[in-house]
Swiss-Prot record:
Gene3D superfamilies to which the protein is assigned, alphabetical: 2.160.20.70, 3.30.70.260
Family under the similarity heading: Belongs to the MinC family.
Protein name in the entry: Probable septum site-determining protein MinC
Originating organism: Burkholderia mallei (strain ATCC 23344)
Domain of life: Bacteria
Keywords annotated in UniProt: Cell cycle, Cell division, Septation
Length: 270
């Protein structure tokens, strides 16, 4: 077989970042009701986004009809690209005809016992323990296509450089940072800033901010004027479906995770 490089196409190993729809119950009625509840107030948030169905939190004896779950997600305009499962779940998970993907999230999904553990009261955030399902940002890895890169990839630095954006972000614009992200202009409604590390916004945040998207639970969001459509850390998110308290709305804040809850706290700058 000739190893000559084709001018028309290449096959290479690669990975794709996507949302995980984490199934935590085999009760389809409860799952459907929770999904409708989440989307009826904010139907456009995940419209046309790709998603993988994650069944790793189901008990060993539990099975779910993946075709039905795919239909539910299609109904809210999400595009299912595959399934994430434990090795012992592969046989039945593959029966739906969806590709089996490997998630590269830093923290493995917690067990049901961990889901049911008591947590301290905090600002309402989605998802909370005990809910039927949640979305997380992760990196399912596509199957090896069989063609290696032309040359070895350089070693990745232990920490990615900070990305600084010194302009306003308008509706439809998206910024992604491999490390921390600093934004010096307003993030308008419909704009989105995403970082694997922390996010600092020295202007109004009116769009979406997603920090720690590969499962970094230590990531934080800092903002000088909080008026967001959505905030998220390590896949745990909150929308303005639940109005923000007066002491943080439009104020300087930091947002962090504490025991799987989003904590939104005023910043004392003086």
């Amino acid at each position: 077989m000739s190893l000559k490089k084709s001018p028309f196409f290449e096959l290479r190993s690669g990975s794709v970042d996507t949302l995980l729809f984490i199934v935590k119950t085999a009760d389809l009625d409860a799952l459907r009701a929770e999904l409708v509840k989440r989307f009826e107030a904010t139907p456009e948030f995940f419209a046309d986004d790709v998603v993988a169905i994650d069944v790793r939190r189901l008990a060993d004896h539990e099975r779910v009809p993946l075709d039905d779950i795919r239909g539910m997600l299609n109904d809210v305009r999400m595009r299912v690209i595959g399934v994430v499962a434990q090795p012992e779940q592969h046989a039945w998970a593959a029966s739906a005809g969806l590709p089996l993907l490997e998630a590269r999230d830093r923290r493995a999904p917690s067990s049901k016992a961990a889901d049911e553990a008591p947590v301290q009261q905090a600002e309402p955030a989605a998802p909370a323990a005990g809910q039927a399902a949640l979305f997380e940002q992760a990196g399912p890895t596509l199957a090896d296509a069989g063609a290696p890169p032309e040359s070895p990839a350089p070693a990745v630095a232990a920490q990615s450089a900070t990305l600084v954006v010194d302009r306003p972000l308008h509706s439809g614009q998206q910024i992604y940072a491999k490390g921390d992200l600093v934004v010096l202009g307003p993030v308008s409604y419909g704009a989105e800033v995403i970082a694997e590390g922390n996010i600092h916004i020295y202007a109004p945040l009116r769009g979406r901010a997603l920090a720690g998207v590969h499962g970094n639970h230590d990531a934080r969001i800092f903002c000088t004027c909080l008026e967001p459509e959505l905030i998220s850390i390590a896949g745990i998110y909150r929308t303005t479906e639940n109005p923000l308290p007066a002491d943080v709305l439009g104020k300087s804040v930091q947002i962090r995770l504490e025991q799987e809850k989003l904590m939104i706290e005023p910043l004392r700058l003086t």
